[in-house]
């Protein structure tokens, strides 16, 4: 009876011990992870400092190389000037040039067009013809021409203000006073405040010409023989002198 009870107690102790060890391992794992993060931060900071220092070092090296190159070129220039003899003391004899032929153009006047890939070197002494083309001389402008000034542009005309349109009044023809007037016709005005209408009268009938009465026409107009007292009888004897 005591055997199985002792075995059960041993399993419980083992379980508790294993559980305690597991908690301890988890705690150690977290501590090591924190230490690892700190070490990574330090490593990143060191790498940044290293790159910054390398850049500064390269700048100083470039400055040193430039100064050494300038010293070397200065020393080489001094050695060349000391080793070469003075040419100004012994001038070289001038060669006689043959006069150019009339038909053959001089090589200095010929100018080849520059190519896009290989540009030609500029000549040392430009010809007088090219210099005259480069800078042509013009007579100065007269003072009267320079004194003239362009007329200033006229300012823009101001826009006219739009006036409000007034209501139009009706114009109706009124008949003559001698015509009979019928009843007045009233029309309302177009304005809001116009309440009085204009009195209009009907148009009178058209007047017909009076009938011709044949009895009123004098009989002398229908007679063939005229009276002797007419003022136009003596026109037949009128003579007109036309100068030649």
Swiss-Prot record:
It is found in: Nucleus. Residues 99-115, 122-136 have a biased composition (Low complexity). One of its GO terms (biological process) is DNA repair. InterPro entries: INO80E (IPR026678), INO80E_N (IPR056515). One of its GO terms (cellular component) is Ino80 complex. Residues 59-187, 222-244 are annotated as: Disordered. Residues 230-244 have a biased composition (Acidic residues). Residues 10-54 form a coiled coil. There is a cross-link at residues 159, 171 (Glycyl lysine isopeptide (Lys-Gly) (interchain with G-Cter in SUMO2)). The keyword Transcription regulation applies. Keywords: Coiled coil, DNA damage, DNA recombination, DNA repair, Isopeptide bond, Nucleus, Transcription, Transcription regulation, Ubl conjugation. Residues 157-171 have a biased composition (Basic residues). Component of the chromatin remodeling INO80 complex; specifically part of a complex module associated with the N-terminus of INO80. PANTHER family: INO80 COMPLEX SUBUNIT E. Putative regulatory component of the chromatin remodeling INO80 complex which is involved in transcriptional regulation, DNA replication and probably DNA repair. This is INO80 complex subunit E. It comes from Bos taurus. The gene is INO80E.
């Amino acid at each position: 009876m005591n055997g199985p009870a002792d075995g059960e107690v041993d399993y419980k102790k083992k379980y508790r011990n294993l559980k305690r060890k597991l908690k301890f391992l988890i705690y150690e794992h977290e501590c090591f992870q924190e230490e690892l993060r700190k070490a990574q931060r330090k490593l990143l900071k060191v790498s940044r400092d290293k790159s910054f220092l390398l850049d500064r070092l390269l700048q100083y090296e470039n400055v040193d190389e430039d100064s050494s190159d300038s010293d070397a070129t200065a020393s080489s220039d001094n050695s060349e000037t000391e080793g070469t003899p003075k040419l100004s003391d012994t001038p070289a004899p001038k060669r006689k040039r043959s006069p150019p032929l009339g038909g053959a153009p001089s090589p200095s006047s010929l100018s080849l067009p520059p190519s896009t890939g290989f540009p030609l070197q500029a000549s040392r002494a430009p010809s007088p013809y090219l210099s005259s083309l480069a800078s042509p001389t013009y007579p100065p402008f007269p003072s009267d021409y320079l004194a003239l000034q362009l007329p200033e542009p006229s300012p823009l005309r101001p826009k006219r203000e739009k006036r409000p349109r007034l209501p139009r009044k009706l114009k109706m023809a009124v008949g003559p006073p001698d015509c009979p007037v019928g009843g007045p016709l009233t029309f309302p005005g177009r304005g809001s405040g116009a309440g009085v209408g204009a009195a209009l009268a009907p148009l009178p009938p058209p007047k017909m010409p009076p009938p011709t009465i044949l009895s009123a026409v004098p009989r002398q107009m229908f007679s063939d023989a005229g009276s002797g007292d007419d003022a136009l009888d003596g026109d037949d004897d009128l003579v007109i002198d036309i100068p030649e």
